[in-house]
Structures are given as C-alpha cells and as structure tokens.
C-alpha cells in the first residue's frame, strides 16, 4: 500500500527489482499510471493497477493459510471526557481560537497550526497529565486521581480488571512515549506485572522481555509498547488481546 499512497514510481522500482526483464522503462510506466500533478488516483487507474499486480503478486488470506484461527473481533469504545479533560480541552481551543478561524497561530502556516492544535487535543483525550501543571503536586503522589482524570484510562482500568479476572494477557500500544510513562505509573499503582518497550529499549532487552512474556507460566499480564518501536521484530504470541490506547493516524 505504501508505494501507491506515496508515489507510483516507487511501485515501478519494486516491480523492476522483481521483474527487470519486464519492467525495463520507468518512463513508460510513469506515463501509463501516474496521475497528473495534484490529481487524485481515480477508480479506473486503481482497476488497472489491480489487474497488473494480480499478474505479479500472490495474495494469501488468513482463511486460505490457517482455517483454524478464529476471526478477529474489533471493538471501538466511545467515552466522554473527564471534567479535567474538558477544562484542558477548552483551554487549548480558547488559546488558539484565532487559528481555528483564520488557519494561523503563532505565525505558522495554516495547515501546520491546525495540526499543532489537533495534536494538543489528542494529548488531552489521552490524559491531561501530558500537560505540564495538570497533575496535582508537588508532591506527586500516585492515586485514583491518575485514573479518574482521564475518561480513556478510567475505561481501560475497568477493561483490564475484567481481562485479568478472565485469565487474558494484553498488549497495549501507544504513539506517545510520555503516555507510556503514565501507563507505567498506572500499572505500578494497580500492581500489574508488565513489560515495557519503547525507542530506548536495546535489542538485548527486547529479546529478554519477549522471552519472559512468552515463557510458560509467566506472571506478566501486560506488555506496553510505543507504536513505532513495537512495529518490527516483535513476537508476542501468548497475548490474546490488543488495546490501541492511542492509534496512529498514519499507520
């Protein structure tokens, strides 16, 4: 999917690597398949690409390879903001209200400014403690406030309690490393056994944690991963539940 999303010339490069005797000229391919500058890929062009790829690639579905695997069950949970989240949401919007109307804030371009606002709103929805000054303290003391001040974490707390009672084992993915820090505080507050993997985890530590999590009789209930660090070379086959706490908008 990535070459088609980025630039179709990348697709030609892959096909040329696989079949150099067939895909000899990139110019012919570019003229035949690349849309005009700024134009969207239309349905006719997509159909032509599908016909081409069907002759070059073998697509094998899960149902063709392993019929014994149960179907994936995907659940989307919608929930309200906590009072603290609602307040911080309002603060973000009021601080940048001019940008929402004009497309500019702080002298930046319109699209960049709006993206920055959206990123702050995403942080509010994940947990208000991602903002400096939101967490009560000092002293900073773990407690129920960590859970109650985030609607998303409050639901996760109830979900994990039921999953643990049912003997399940869980993977949790986050895009923000700071959010992983907050989840780690929550795991320790609830006394859940867990493993953590992010961009600072060495290859040796990564292998050791995977072995420990997958070990028969392991007491590790949770494995929390940052999305980018956890996308390569990970094999956690003993988990049966995946939670996307903060899904990546551009996977």
What do these predicted ranges mean?
Residues 1-41, 50-251:
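ASCE P-loop NTPase motor core, strongest for the SF2 helicase catalytic module
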Residues 46:
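Cys/His-rich Zn2+-binding cysteine-cluster or related metal-binding knuckle/ribbon modules and their
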